[in-house]
């Protein structure tokens, strides 16, 4: 299969992966309305073309949390990444490191912190949930700090798992799930050999290290179901500050008031995110939520964004809407499943090229020059309020 654009990796991944794994990353919550709107709303953001601007000295480099990034992109935390390629977290981290951007390790990764961190030169980021087992949280924070992780990404939009109906149909959950997954693996020999046989152990490394025993897929589902904490509040974040003195990013913000609360708390950054449409169907897409949030807190806190980003043009759109940096999730996982480290590296090269084209044709020589002025309202169309530039009074 020819890979000429970032979007080609999705089709390639669907051929390679057993259905239970493909649909686990490809699907969303309920009827997947928000999942679709994440992509559709972002694709409708029109950019303002500018010409004759002498773009010979264009640069994508930016700075975030005292780190220099080759472009305003980081790899998002993705659970079970090591099931998509052999020791997938290690491969994805290596590709990000070579590109000069951060890799974020998920709490529920296959490869533990201690396996991934020593393989890369730049400090890794670590993602953590608020869980009932505070002993695990403290253990994870201490291990992340000992491994040299620089930034904590704290996910707050998952006090309970979303209703992901596609998982029951694909074999990730539901009746006879284990047997269905087994036969799917048999029918996908490339994955079965590379990951199923040679990618072991298939446990959740960070959790296994704490519990002192392997945690397989069924354990993963059960452990998460029992440990997500609906009582989560800002007080829990205050407790975490006792064990983490580095940059802290709050992931899962969709409302300007929550963004202001993050500033008042003293967070270093937020991620405008609806969890890729995997939690609550019917909420705003990140593209629609971002402008009002940026209007409320831009300059007071670093603003990251995810959900719906599939290519370099989408990165430029998100920055024009108010983000400082974006996180890639599904896009890099499709590439990882297709060709491992090389696939992720190629995806990042494609995104870089697409960003350069978009910036050249919009007259933005640097990331700081991408702003609301880079957007244009299309003739005959009214831009939705949440995508339109807003004044401070409008955002209140």
Swiss-Prot record:
Domain of life: Bacteria
Membrane topology, as annotated: Peripheral membrane protein
SUPFAM superfamilies, per database record: FMN-linked oxidoreductases
EC number: 1.1.-.-
The FMN hydroxy acid dehydrogenase domain, residue ranges: 1-380
Compartments where located: Cell inner membrane
Binding site for FMN: 106, 127, 155, 251, 306-330
Catalytic activity: (S)-lactate + A = pyruvate + AH2
Molecular functions per Gene Ontology: FMN binding; L-lactate dehydrogenase activity
PANTHER family: L-LACTATE DEHYDROGENASE, S -2-HYDROXY-ACID OXIDASE-RELATED
Annotated function: Catalyzes the conversion of L-lactate to pyruvate. Is coupled to the respiratory chain.
Name of this protein: L-lactate dehydrogenase
Taxonomic lineage: Bacteria, Pseudomonadati, Pseudomonadota, Gammaproteobacteria, Enterobacterales
Encoding gene (name): lldD
